[in-house]
Amino acid sequence: MRLVIARCSVDYIGRLEAHLPMADRLLMVKADGSVSIHADDRAYKPLNWMTPPCTLTETTHEESETGESIPLWIVENKKGEQLRITIEALHSDMYYDLGEDPGLQKDGVEAHLQELLAEHIETLGDGYSLVRREYPTPIGPVDILCRDDKGGSVAVEIKRRGGIDGVEQLSRYLELLNRDDLLAPVAGVFAAQHIKPQARTLAEDRGIRCVTLDYDSLRGIESTELRLF
């Protein structure tokens, strides 16, 4: 990973045009080739980004007023969309090899919820059938991939406490899975013991169904039914 802190401006050129004026920002270049631009707010969300596959070309261009050559990064994807990052001042430039990430390790309850739901996948609806648990994608495994009563693909993300991060994670999985002609269209189910109101609103706005899981009921202590909302 490369982390650059610089005073820069950013121009996006593609389906539309967008401009970030000159300011101090963090530029993050990951091993997969992705490039993202961050400010000192917005939590984990970048101001702008380019996902792989894309290329990063470091060059210079002449400043019109002074005639001085200043650094210019050109990040371009296969569609020809570009991020043009003009660097006025470089504060820090650091490389670090993070190595292969083992991925997110679910806690015991989440892992057991996944196992139980996979065993009783029909609790999501009559006619549902399991394809597999931990369905692999380039950005990590989907908890459960199944099919509904009409044969449509459904990706299920399971959390103990469902927040916005979980909805965003499922949204990224759905974006990738829907590029696969053998699976598309792929619907989403966000399942958790407790789903925060903001997460539910975001999920429903994106067409993702929310399912509240009762851990004890799934284990057969009270009943075998889920409460669906």
Curated annotation (Swiss-Prot):
Keywords: Cytoplasm, DNA-binding, Endonuclease, Hydrolase, Nuclease. One of its GO terms (molecular function) is single-stranded DNA endodeoxyribonuclease activity. Pfam families: NucS_C (PF01939), NucS_N (PF21003). Its EC number is 3.1.-.-. InterPro entries: Endonuclease_NucS, NucS_C, NucS_N, NucS_N_sf, tRNA_endonuc-like_dom_sf. It is found in: Cytoplasm. Gene3D superfamilies: 2.70.180.20, 3.40.1350.10. GO terms for cellular component: cytoplasm. Its main location: cytoplasm. Cleaves both 3' and 5' ssDNA extremities of branched DNA structures. HAMAP family: NucS. Belongs to the NucS endonuclease family. This is Endonuclease NucS. It comes from Corynebacterium diphtheriae (strain ATCC 700971 / NCTC 13129 / Biotype gravis).
